[in-house]
């Protein structure tokens, strides 16, 4: 059966809103995530007179490349997000950077309704778990340090920029890239071409273009000397928390919420990104990657500091307490049953 056209898929997502809104009758609070669920939360607020809490993980107006993926469905996602955020009783931004973006994109939203609650992670699940067996299974040389990327093939995640930087990285250094689920055929073809070019011009690229189990990802995070996040737009950066929890140093773009996670010079390095200066960005990215791959002691020190930061600032208990406090504030101080 052929895949539905993007516009049809967007309408199907809208139809799910009706079922979600009907299912929450009798709830004290409705809390939604993503543009289509947020519209469902808005409908539930109208029908059942319950407070609607809306978490913003990213903003549609700041992702114009989504039009390439969604077609006319992008206009629908813009409408749903605006309607939801302007009508919500409380809006949670996953970073201070996102909070600023919300108020810039939607000036009619009362700033007092927008709070920051970071995303969280379970550091007991994501912890150092090295595995030479996993490295060998993927064709990675355990005797050589490597830089690691894990993410979707999208404009947002900056994979073409990382592949351009790979041409500038010391050719004796290994680069391991796990990437799948391209947004469009166009970006899939672009990335395939860049991978071929990197392989022609240098060795040491391990390209894994398929989904791999979480256990294997944790092993790769744990064995990597550095995790690379070259995103051009990143409201938070959960994958960075996953890497840091596994004691991996980070080299990342200085965009969005990333500077709220990575402490410059302590848990990794931040690289300035400007759309009009991508060559400077890829050169700086390659330089920081080489620096950490050439200095294992520094990479280990940053990795250990990163895990400590995750445990103290991004564990789920702290995130849950902040969220429950927001619910109780909306309910006039009434306690939420645990």
Name what the model sees in each region.
Residues 97, 120:
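Carbohydrate-associated surface elements
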Residues 226, 249-252, 262:
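Short hydrophobic beta-strand element within catalytic cores of glycosyltransferases
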Residues 219-224:
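Short alpha-helical donor nucleotide-sugar binding micro-motif in glycosyltransferases
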Residues 141-157, 163-166, 176:
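Conserved donor-binding/catalytic core segment of Leloir-type glycosyltransferases
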Residues 50-53, 61-83, 100:
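Nucleotide-sugar donor phosphate/pyrophosphate-binding loop at the beta->alpha transition
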Residues 188-211, 215:
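Nucleotide-activated donor-binding/catalytic signature segment of Leloir-type glycosyltransferases, i.e.
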Residues 232:
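Aromatic "clamp/platform" in nucleotide-sugar-dependent glycosyltransferases that forms part
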């Amino acid at each position: 059966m052929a895949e539905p056209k993007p516009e049809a898929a967007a309408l199907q997502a809208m139809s799910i809103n009706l079922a979600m809104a009907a299912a929450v009758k009798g709830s004290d609070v409705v809390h939604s995530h993503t543009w289509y669920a947020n519209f469902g939360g808005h409908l539930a607020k109208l029908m059942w007179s319950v407070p609607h809490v809306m978490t913003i993980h990213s903003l549609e107006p700041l992702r114009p490349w989504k039009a390439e993926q969604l077609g006319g469905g992008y206009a629908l996602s813009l409408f749903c997000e605006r309607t939801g955020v302007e009508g919500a009783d409380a809006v949670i931004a996953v970073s201070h950077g996102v909070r600023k973006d919300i108020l810039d994109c939607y000036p009619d939203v009362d700033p007092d309704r927008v709070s920051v609650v970071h995303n969280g992670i379970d550091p007991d699940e994501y912890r150092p778990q090295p595995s030479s067996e996993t490295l060998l299974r993927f064709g990675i040389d355990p005797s050589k340090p490597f830089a690691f990327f894990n993410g979707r093939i999208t404009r947002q995640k900056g994979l073409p920029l990382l592949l351009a930087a790979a041409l500038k990285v010391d050719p004796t250094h290994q680069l391991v890239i796990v990437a799948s689920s391209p947004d469009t055929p166009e970006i899939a073809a672009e990335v395939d071409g860049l991978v071929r070019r990197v392989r022609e011009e240098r060795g040491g690229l391990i390209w894994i273009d398929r989904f791999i189990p979480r256990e294997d990802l944790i092993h790769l995070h744990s064995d990597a000397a550095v995790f690379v996040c070259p995103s051009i737009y990143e409201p938070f950066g959960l994958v960075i928390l996953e890497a840091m929890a596994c004691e991996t140093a980070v080299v990342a773009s200085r965009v969005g919420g990333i500077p709220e996670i990575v402490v410059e010079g302590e848990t990794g390095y931040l690289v300035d990104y400007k759309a009009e200066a991508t060559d400077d960005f890829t050169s700086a990215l390659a330089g920081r990657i080489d620096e950490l791959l050439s200095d294992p002691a520094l990479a280990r020190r940053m990795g250990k500091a990163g895990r400590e930061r995750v445990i103290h600032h991004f564990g789920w208990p702290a995130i849950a307490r902040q969220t429950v406090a927001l619910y109780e504030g909306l309910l006039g101080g009434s306690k939420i049953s645990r």
